[in-house]
Amino acid sequence: MDFIHILALAILQGLTEFLPISSSAHLILLPVLAGWTDQGLAFDVAVHLGTLVAVISYFRLELARMARDWLQSLAAGQQQGESRLAWAVLLGTLPVGLVGIMLTETTQEALRSPLIIAWSTVGFGFLLAYADWAGKQQRNEHTLTWRDILFIGLAQALALIPGTSRSGITITAGLMLGLTREGAARFSFLLAIPVILLAGGLAALDLLNHTETVDWNALALGALISGLCAYACIHYFFKFLQRIGMLPFAVYRLLLGALLFYLFS
């Protein structure tokens, strides 16, 4: 991989991991437009590691409180401080984990069809715009009931359909439940941590069964760039979220979906 290839893919991963615009739609489009070959599993693991470090770094203080209070709640046998939010993240991760285990390799391959990605990019783009317009936006992530958490978790499982966008569908679900934009986004990004960890771990295990040559310099550079981009993306997303809302992302998804239909239909 040359520097431009590494730079483009790492920036793309860093930005699309957390913006509600579908990373899979971009990752299928970029190689077609640039004429690049597949970057390999090792590079995918590296850039996901970069985004994982970024989101953990951004929420480091909140995560420390959640971990402390969660451990105290286990010892005390009752909720302590931020322990409920920690349990919420764990419960919200269960559906996507269970569905991911049940999906066969054949099903996963079929879902990677460019037209399926195009349809899900457009369809869930409309849903995101509607949720942002119709949602009451009166609650934060700390007010979620267990039923709410399960609803968001089930919505997150839909992200296994490429083109859906994990952050997009979880933010959409949060807005539908009356969360503020910031509350929906914060819970979505907290949910990203175990999901990226699980996906990256499975990919790393799969990598052990491959014999591909590893370019460690490319992996390190890719992880660094994707991590920096992801951190900046999270920071500025929250900074401008209340001002711009979800409509620009929904419109972008519609345009992206239209381009995918044009190229692959």
From Swiss-Prot:
Pfam families: BacA. It is a multi-pass membrane protein. GO terms for molecular function: undecaprenyl-diphosphatase activity. The keyword Transmembrane applies. It catalyses: di-trans,octa-cis-undecaprenyl diphosphate + H2O = di-trans,octa-cis-undecaprenyl phosphate + phosphate + H(+). The keyword Transmembrane applies. It is found in: Cell inner membrane. Coiled coil: none annotated. Its EC number is 3.6.1.27. Its main location: membrane. InterPro entries: UppP. It comes from the Bacteria. It is an enzyme of class 3 (hydrolase). One of its GO terms (cellular component) is plasma membrane. Keywords: Antibiotic resistance, Cell inner membrane, Cell membrane, Cell shape, Cell wall biogenesis/degradation, Hydrolase, Membrane, Peptidoglycan synthesis, Transmembrane, Transmembrane helix. Bacitracin is thought to be involved in the inhibition of peptidoglycan synthesis by sequestering undecaprenyl diphosphate, thereby reducing the pool of lipid carrier available. NCBIfam families: PRK00281.2-4, undec_PP_bacA. Catalyzes the dephosphorylation of undecaprenyl diphosphate (UPP). Confers resistance to bacitracin. PANTHER family: UNDECAPRENYL-DIPHOSPHATASE. This is Undecaprenyl-diphosphatase. The lineage of its organism: Bacteria, Pseudomonadati, Pseudomonadota, Gammaproteobacteria, Chromatiales.
